Amino acid sequence: MSMRIYIFLLTVCFTFQMRAQQVPDWENPRVVGINKEEYHSTLTLPSGKSSCEEIVSLNGRWKFYWSPDPQSRPSDFYKNNFDVSGWDNISVPGTWQLQGYGKPIYTNWTYPFKKDQPKVTGEPPKHFFSYENRNPVGSYVTTFDVSEDMKDKQLYLHFEGVKSAMYVWINGKKVGYSQNSMAPAEFDITGYVNEGQNRLAVEVYRWSDGSYLEDQDMWRFSGIYRPVELWVRPKIHIKDYSLTTDLADDFSSAGFKAKVWLRNLSDSKSGKLSLEDLL
């Protein structure tokens, strides 16, 4: 009898474990990022990016395939031998709804999908666009070059904004996952790239469990809607900073304080550094 109970409990535990493993990241509130860099203060003003040698723009025309739901997406598209030559071209940055894929949705009083938190693929009313299009997926592919002088640098892939969730691959290898539509996402891709041409694949989901929070009175678009950049940084660089001012009682003057966090990814653990400021 005890053996039967043991086998039953083991079967139940295995079933629950399998169900937990089948929950996608974009419907799992415990997962908001995988292998993603920590958030930090703005390191470069937008007006100075065009003249910054450490920032390489990856904006342009990317290969693109739109799927009405996750089940019909090309799941192997990230592989190096997957042929995307017959795919459409899409502008990045840009939402895919304004480029002929799917439909823009405006709502100010209800969710544009079935309310079943944290799920976003349940069956909504038949008049909903999401009734026949359960969480559309956009598959993006592009290439970029890594020069010889970049190989001794630290390389970061920087997305300024992607709605609503995305997976990233470099040269067929999974780099990570991110959601949080209104904030940047960065990945350290130093160990994923080769000298010469590299293949970047991004899989974007229109909805995620984060969409329950991103429910303002607004038009609902999706895609890689803000710039994508390759950040080429030295092995020792500023990771983050904090700036504060202490005002005098009469507000006639103020003391300026700066805290700077450095990241050292070089082989040298000691040395002399200088910090310059321009006010």
Where are these regions (language model features)?
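Short beta-strand segments of immunoglobulin-like
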Residues: 242-250
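Short, charged, solvent-exposed linker or helix-capping segments at domain edges/interfaces
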Residues: 74-76, 213, 238-242, 273
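Bacterial Sec-dependent N-terminal signal peptides
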Residues: 1-22
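Short glycine/proline-rich turn/loop motifs
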Residues: 118-129
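Accessory carbohydrate-binding/adhesion or oligomerization-edge regions at the termini
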Residues: 20-119, 199-207, 230
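Accessory beta-strand-rich segments of carbohydrate-active enzymes
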Residues: 25, 30-33, 48-49, 63-67, ...
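Short, surface-exposed loop/turn motifs at beta-strand boundaries within globular domains
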Residues: 55-57, 80, 135-139, 150, ...
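Beta-strand-rich binding/interaction modules
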Residues: 170, 253-279
